Curated annotation (Swiss-Prot):
Sites marked Essential for catalytic activity: H136, E174
Its job: Catalyzes the conversion of D-ribulose 5-phosphate to formate and 3,4-dihydroxy-2-butanone 4-phosphate.
Record's protein name: 3,4-dihydroxy-2-butanone 4-phosphate synthase
Native source organism of the sequence: Shewanella putrefaciens (strain CN-32 / ATCC BAA-453)
Molecular-function GO term, any one: manganese ion binding
Keyword Lyase part of the UniProt annotation: yes
Enzyme class: lyase
GO biological process, one term: riboflavin biosynthetic process
NCBIfam families: ribB (TIGR00506)
Length: 217
């Protein structure tokens, strides 16, 4: 990762702290993964504070494939099976079947309907029967251990929510350029500056978590 481009955002620890503060305030963060991996940036919001306006931004400014990151135990509680039996995607992204709230939605595709679906899925005591399958929201199952186990946006999202003291569920979508191509680090930094959204990396989250473990040790 070209850390020099990220220098204006502070050190790795400072970038994570800025991201956690934004999430606690109900705002979003931009997280970029490794250059030798997807080399993409995702706009991420906490599921519990997600608004219709934020969902509209995910649909308008990003790829439109809005995903709900959930920990393994939540996926099991909602009885969400994998989207496919044999996952052959390059990075093993753990999509489950897509979902829709059974109550409170129309077609399910509008920003408001997708927020309703997400709130239904993350509700305390949510049951499998609360959700229809398929739908317009795409859950992703995070691996236990977070970014120390798998350096993906899914795990990074759950780690950030837990570090921020929020419910372990987050919503993400890949940032795209106006021409439909994937945004890379320079474009993501510009996007963050335009919308006043902090930028950090998966590597930053790894370093932050390792520093916490070192302090505990």
């Amino acid at each position: 990762m070209n850390q020099s481009l990220l220098a204006p955002f502070g050190t790795a620890i400072e970038r994570v702290e800025a991201g956690l503060n934004a999430l606690r305030q109900g705002q979003g963060v931009l997280v970029v993964d490794d250059e030798d991996r997807e080399n993409e940036g995702d706009l991420i919001f906490a599921a519990q504070t997600l608004t219709n306006t934020q969902m509209a931004m995910l649909i308008r400014e990003c790829s439109g494939i809005v995903c709900l990151c959930l920990p393994d135990e939540k996926v099991k509680a909602l009885e969400l099976p994998p989207m496919v039996e044999n996952n052959s995607s390059q990075y093993g992204t753990a999509f489950t079947v897509s979902i829709e709230a059974k109550v409170g939605v129309t077609t399910g595709v509008s920003a408001a309907d997708r927020v309703t679906t997400i709130k239904a899925a993350i509700a305390d005591g949510a049951k499998p029967s609360d959700l229809a399958r398929p739908g317009h929201v795409y859950p992703l199952r995070a691996q236990p251990g977070g970014v120390l186990t798998r350096r993906g946006h899914t795990e990074g999202t759950i780690d950030l929510m837990q570090l921020a003291g929020l419910k372990p569920a987050g919503v993400l979508c890949e940032v795209t350029n106006p021409d439909g191509t994937m945004a890379r680090l320079p474009e993501i930094i510009a996007f963050g500056a335009q919308h006043n959204i902090p930028v950090l990396t998966i590597e930053d989250i790894v370093l932050y978590r390792k520093s916490l473990l070192a302090n505990v040790g």
